[in-house]
Each structure stands twice: as structure tokens, then as C-alpha cells.
């Protein structure tokens, strides 16, 4: 299983991790991981025609995320129900498994898998994988596909999963729940006011926008199903905004050949190029206070492109493509695919490899070290980073008491994507949606570390004076040699969601030297912290009274790391 720099890599059967893990591998280092526990996901039966892969995925995520049942474990999909699912259906479930907090996922293979490899001109790569007669697992999740119903994940997490018919039947109850959740999520931003109850007309929820996009939704089979629902409804969209992004150029080409794209465009659907933009706010950003439905991987706060610093808020609910199509062609009123009686059939798919052969350069094993690298003026190298000193003096610059902090909150997606080649620029967005004061506070304490490195005794004297309150009275000139200065972030469970290493590297660029939490939401994020030289501390207590602007003094921390100590002592120093 190769490493891949994306949390959504499950669909390609790669292990999704942050970029530094790939860099280590390219340097000949090992990928370090404790042998994971394995959870059997036993599938039985067959899904109803109106049920899609997102419905199965949300059923799973809703059952296991909040109780941590599969956290950092490998999911192994087995059972008689697997053979009743097409490969597109399996991939649609698989790309969502990351949202369960699992480490990765694997599937039993069969004749359909073999056919899939043959279609993609790779018959020799197929391997039959089945569980042994005496296979043992660390836990079991059973899903009866016959009983899965159309689902909806309400804002602001895929685990907020409910049967779609329940939300349709009681709109005030469920939209009221989302409004209350928004108050909690944005409690520090008094400019945010989410009012979803305004979306209820004559007892029905009116949606503002719909999108189907990316690895989770843009499959050939999904989009063909949308076309067939559109044909059943026999009318156009009117003014309702419905956008579809195929998962790849080969998929788009085949949809074009079969006439599906032409059909959808005639009905008023905006069919766009292969791109996952709506998933992370890079396209189709909704209007303020809009309520959107999407078949994509995540619906975290502001991930859809709104900017809370400007008082903006929108909300995204996740649904399967079939129910999204049913809603879109019902005037935007929330509708289950179960209510649209349709016979689904999938045209034969043909993979056109020329699309990649004619555009992708395969340089593997063809090193050309003489080739000059081209750098534009906006591409910047990483700053010099200080070596870990014997002791550390850290200022608490942010305390986040949410139960889970996502990587989207640590560093937003969308508008930041264009700055990924400039570590200084992108770091300016760190925690901007959750704690707008973080960047300024981190930079303020970082100036003292810069002064320490440059030998500015006069400047660092003012920060080292705080150590005298705990009996450390050495001169600043001496402390400069032994005690580094930086910032620390506290969050209960940081790192859910994307594998993006910027969630850690941006803290480091701003002088962040440690995280403290109850537990890390994912191994990926903890590994990113380690790889960027951020100390990943945990506190067993469910709650801590650590407060912003307090200091932590960590004596002999370098030696503790070298010795592999599992517990260290720290001194909390109040600024008063």
C-alpha cells in the first residue's frame, strides 16, 4: 500500500498521510506506525434502488464516529453484501471512510474487481483478496444493506447523520438543532447568525444550491443515475443552482460519449470540468446564510467557502447523488430519491487511457538532475527553524474547548490553496476562522525567539524575567543558550479530517513548538506535528484550566525527547 498525500486516498487504496511522511519515504526512511487493530465491516443484503453509496457511508459514520469505535483502526469490508455492490458503489463508500476517523480501509475482491482492473487496462494487477476461514478481528460492524435508507448529514460534520425522511417530516426540529450547533461553533464570533428556519416554506425545506463533485460523488454510475432521475421528472431545473463535477477526465469523456452530459445540460444542470472544488470551498461558494446539499466528503464549518471574519456563514448537508437529484428536480425542496420511482441502469463504461498518456509525464526511474527548477516570485522556501533546545519557555496563545477541532479550522482550505507554495503567506490564515487573534499572538512571541537566535540580549531579558517567579534567575545571556521560546496551542481533540500538513507546518512557521490535547483526532495530524518539530503532548484530564497568555516552562525537554520519556513535568506560570 503506497503512501499518498491526501486523507481521501482510501479510494485509490493508498494510505493517506501528510506530505512529510512521503518526504521521509523518498529519503529512504521508514513509515512508522504501530500495528493497527482491524474492524470487520460485514455487509449483508443488497441496497434498494434509491439508495446510493453516500447513504451507506453516512449510516456507518453516524454509528462509529462519536464513540471512537474505529478510530485509527483499519476497516475491512467483507461479507456476502460486497458482491452485490458495483465497484463505483464500493469506491463511493470507501472514499468516505476517512470521516469515520479510521486509519484506512480495505475490501475483499471478487470478479467485479477483476473486471474493473480489466476495463482500466490493468488485468495483471488484480489480486483476489478474501478473509481466511479463521480470520480474527478486533471488532465488528454489521450493515444490512437491505435496511439502509436515504440519509442526510446535517452541518457541521458527516457524523450528524439522520434518515432523510425524518428531517423532511420534522424540519423545525432538525434545522433548530443546526442553529443551536452554529451558536456553539461560532460562540466567539458575535457577527455570525445562522437562520435556517427561514428555509421552511409550507412545512418543506427549500434548499439554495446543490453540488455533486470529486472522488466521493463524480463517478460514472452516480452521474448516470442523476441523468435517469432527471429524465423521469421530465422538466428542467428552472432557477435552482445544480452543479456536477465528474471525478476524472476519462469519466467525463465517457459521459459525453453516452450523451449523459448533453441530457443534463438540457435540463439546466451546470456540468463542469473534473474538479473537487465544492468540497473545499474552491468553487460554488454559496451565498450568506444559504443551505446547500452536496455529495462530497465533508461539511465542516466554513469549508464551503464562507468567511466568518466577514460575518459570513453558510451550511452544507451531505446527501447521496440520487436524493440530491430528486431534490434539485423538485424545485429545490428537500426530497428523498425513494419518492421518485425510477428504474436505474448503467451504460457500459470504457476507459480511455490516451487522456493521461498524452498529458501526464511519467518520470519514474528517469532522473534528470540537470533540469533547472522554475520558481515564480510567489514561491518561497521554508524558513530556517531552530533546533530543539535543552529547555523551552512556551506561551499559550490559543485555547480551543470544542470537542473536536478539524484541520479546516486549523488552516482553512479554499482561498488558502493558492498560497501553498508560500509558507509565510499561508501561515497568515492559521486558525483565522476559530481564533482570529492567534496569528498576531504567535508572531508576538516568535519575535523573542528571533531575538534569542540573533543574540539580542536586551530584548529577550523582558521575556526571561517571567522565569524568576519560579526561582530561575540565570542571566539572559545564559538562558539564551539553553532555553528556546515559542508558542503552544491547546485543543481538546485536534486534527480531524484532511491530512494536510499545513495544519501543523503553519503553526511551526509562526513559532509554534507544541500542541497539548486530551487526544489527537487522527494519527495523521499527530504525525504531521512530529514531522514539523511540534511536540505532541497529551493531558489525560477531560478538561484543563490552562488559559491564554499563561506560560509553560519545560525543563530538560530535549533530554526527555532523546530518552523517549512518556511523561514530562511542566511548570505553569501565570502572567499576573
Question: What do the PLM-derived regions correspond to, one by one?
Answer:
Residues 113-114, 250-251, 278-281, 300-301, ...:
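Short gly/pro/ser/thr-enriched loop/turn and capping motifs at secondary-structure boundaries
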Amino acid at each position: 500500500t503506497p503512501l499518498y498525500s491526501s486523507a481521501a486516498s482510501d479510494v485509490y487504496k493508498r494510505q493517506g498521510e501528510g506530505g512529510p511522511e512521503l518526504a521521509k519515504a523518498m529519503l529512504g526512511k521508514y513509515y512508522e506506525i504501530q500495528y493497527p487493530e482491524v474492524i470487520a465491516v460485514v455487509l449483508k443484503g443488497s441496497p434498494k434502488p434509491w439508495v446510493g453509496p453516500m447513504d451507506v457511508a453516512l449510516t456507518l459514520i453516524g454509528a462509529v464516529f462519536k464513540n471512537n469505535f474505529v478510530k485509527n483502526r483499519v476497516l475491512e469490508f467483507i461479507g456476502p453484501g460486497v458482491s452485490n455492490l458495483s465497484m463505483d458503489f464500493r469506491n463511493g463508500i470507501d472514499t468516505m471512510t476517512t470521516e469515520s476517523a479510521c486509519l484506512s480501509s480495505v475490501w475483499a475482491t471478487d470478479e467485479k474487481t477483476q473486471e474493473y482492473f480489466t476495463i482500466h487496462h490493468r488485468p495483471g494487477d488484480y489480486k483476489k483478496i478474501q478473509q481466511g476461514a479463521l480470520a480474527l478481528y478486533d471488532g465488528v460492524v454489521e450493515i444490512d444493506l437491505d435496511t439502509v435508507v436515504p440519509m442526510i448529514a446535517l452541518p457541521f460534520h458527516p457524523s450528524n447523520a439522520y434518515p432523510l425522511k425524518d428531517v423532511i417530516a420534522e424540519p423545525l426540529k432538525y434545522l433548530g438543532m443546526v442553529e443551536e450547533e452554529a451558536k456553539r461553533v461560532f460562540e466567539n464570533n458575535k457577527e455570525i447568525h445562522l437562520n435556517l428556519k427561514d428555509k421552511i416554506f409550507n412545512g418543506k425545506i427549500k434548499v439554495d444550491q446543490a453540488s455533486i463533485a470529486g472522488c466521493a460523488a463524480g463517478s460514472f454510475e452516480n452521474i448516470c443515475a442523476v441523468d435517469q432521475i432527471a429524465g423521469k421528472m421530465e422538466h428542467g431545473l428552472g432557477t435552482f443552482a445544480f452543479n456536477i463535477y465528474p471525478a476524472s477526465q476519462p469519466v467525463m469523456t465517457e459521459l459525453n460519449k453516452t450523451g449523459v452530459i448533453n441530457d443534463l445540460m438540457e435540463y439546466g444542470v451546470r456540468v463542469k470540468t473534473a474538479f473537487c472544488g465544492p468540497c473545499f470551498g474552491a468553487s460554488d461558494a454559496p451565498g450568506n446564510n444559504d443551505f446547500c446539499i452536496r455529495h462530497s466528503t465533508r461539511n465542516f464549518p466554513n469549508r464551503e467557502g464562507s468567511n466568518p471574519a466577514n460575518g459570513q456563514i453558510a451550511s452544507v448537508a451531505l446527501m447521496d447523488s440520487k436524493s440530491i437529484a430528486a431534490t434539485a428536480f423538485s424545485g429545490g425542496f428537500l426530497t428523498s430519491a425513494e419518492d421518485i420511482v425510477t428504474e436505474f441502469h448503467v451504460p457500459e463504461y470504457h476507459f480511455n487511457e490516451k487522456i493521461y498518456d498524452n498529458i501526464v509525464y511519467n518520470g519514474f526511474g528517469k532522473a534528470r538532475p540537470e533540469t533547472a527548477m522554475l520558481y515564480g516570485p510567489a514561491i518561497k522556501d521554508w524558513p530556517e527553524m531552530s533546533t530543539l533546545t535543552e529547555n523551552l519557555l512556551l506561551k499559550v496563545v490559543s485555547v480551543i474547548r470544542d470537542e473536536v477541532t478539524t484541520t479546516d479550522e486549523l488552516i482553512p482550505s479554499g482561498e488558502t490553496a493558492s498560497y501553498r507554495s508560500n509558507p509565510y503567506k499561508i501561515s497568515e490564515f492559521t486558525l483565522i476562522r476559530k481564533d482570529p487573534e492567534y496569528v498576531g499572538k504567535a508572531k508576538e512571541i516568535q519575535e523573542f525567539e528571533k531575538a534569542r537566535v540573533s543574540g539580542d540580549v536586551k530584548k529577550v531579558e523582558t521575556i526571561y524575567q517571567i522565569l524568576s517567579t519560579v526561582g530561575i534567575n540565570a542571566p539572559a545571556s545564559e538562558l539564551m543558550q539553553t532555553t528556546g521560546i515559542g508558542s503552544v496551542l491547546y485543543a481538546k481533540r485536534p486534527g480531524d479530517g484532511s491530512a494536510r500538513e499545513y495544519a501543523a507546518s503553519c503553526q511551526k512557521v509562526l513559532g509554534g513548538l507544541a500542541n497539548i490535547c486530551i487526544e489527537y483526532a487522527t494519527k495523521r495530524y499527530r504525525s504531521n506535528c512530529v514531522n514539523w518539530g511540534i511536540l505532541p503532548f497529551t493531558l489525560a484530564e477531560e478538561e484543563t484550566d490552562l488559559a491564554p497568555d499563561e506560560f509553560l516552562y519545560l525543563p530538560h525537554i530535549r533530554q526527555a525527547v532523546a530518552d523517549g520519556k512518556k511523561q514530562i513535568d511542566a511548570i505553569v506560570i501565570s502572567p499576573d
